[in-house]
Amino acid sequence: MARAMDNAILETILQRVRPLIGQGKVADYIPALASVEGSKLGIAICTVDGQHYQAGDAHERFSIQSISKVLSLVVAMRHYPEEEIWQRVGKDPSGSPFNSLVQLEMEQGIPRNPFINAGALVVCDMLQGRLSAPRQRMLEVVRALCGVSDITYDATVARSEFEHSARNAAIAWLMKSFGNFHHDVPTVLQNYFHYCALKMSCMELARTFVFLANQGEAFHLDEPVVTPMQARQINALMATNGMYQNAGEFAWRVGLPAKSGVGGGIVAIVPHEMAIAVWSPELDPAGNSLAGIAALEQLTQTLGRSVY
């Protein structure tokens, strides 16, 4: 039976999952992320009618990393016809690590979906072709979505990622060899790493993504962010591809469309009701927040929410 929301529920959930801290591992392949304190834990909710709930470190900003892949897809959907996007990137789960080259080689440079690194790089390549200042445009979009004017990039994280970008560069060059990457590789990589280096809090993320819970409309904006069909499509992609190769396990445990990042954040959507953001930097072997998944599992069980 569904329960009403309040901050006390969120506080209780964080107390239940806090013992998991120490069992995961903070991302260390990006040096600027390796220094993040692993004990951080926060959760926030924004409902479609503008109510906010939070607990723990919900107001502390962190690197959103691959959560940004949803935002870059949203921007691409606003600048490209549907058929142009989906002829360059697929919609299916990969079943492989998010930075895999093997599958990309076998499938002639067409990434399985826009939420693995290869797919997100194709989307960024497309944005480079339509936007005069892709990084500035992303900031404008995110600031409008969350209603906060000082959202920015963490330059240290972006630089750290660029300095350790051999694998992502290899992915881009491999796609270029198949004709599925059209612009200067270092330029597009810089844009991609800056998007990943967006610094936001759980509260800001929940507010940013609430349009996906409301058929593409945000309560605080006059114009729709995307169409109802596009919102449905994005939620479907998040449900099938948003948690790296563990999307099935996450669907089993949590039952919501979601997107994670190696910064420890996860955004999840309850259609017609709310957007949820959690943050705990320690990751499981797939690169998803260990305590974050547990918190979302506790929340959906407590509230009686699931899309299944």
From Swiss-Prot:
Highest rank taxon of the organism: Bacteria
- A GO BP annotation: glutamate biosynthetic process
Enzyme Commission number(s) of this protein: 3.5.1.2
Q: Which InterPro entries match?
A: Beta-lactam/transpept-like, Glutaminase
Catalysed transformations (reactions): L-glutamine + H2O = L-glutamate + NH4(+)
Keywords of the record, alphabetical order, are: Hydrolase
Glycoprotein among the record's keywords? no
Instruction: Give the signal peptide as a residue range, or say none if absent.
Output: none
Presence of the UniProt keyword Hydrolase in the record: yes
- Binding annotation for substrate: S66, N117, E161, N168, Y192, Y244, V262
Gene Ontology molecular function terms on file? glutaminase activity
> Known Gene3D superfamilies for this protein?
DD-peptidase/beta-lactamase superfamily (3.40.710.10)
- Which family is this protein grouped under? Belongs to the glutaminase family.
- Tell me the HAMAP family matching this sequence: Glutaminase (MF_00313)
Subunit-level organization:
Homotetramer.
What is the protein name for this chain?
Glutaminase
Q: What organism is the protein native to?
A: Salmonella arizonae (strain ATCC BAA-731 / CDC346-86 / RSK2980)
Tell me the gene name.
glsA
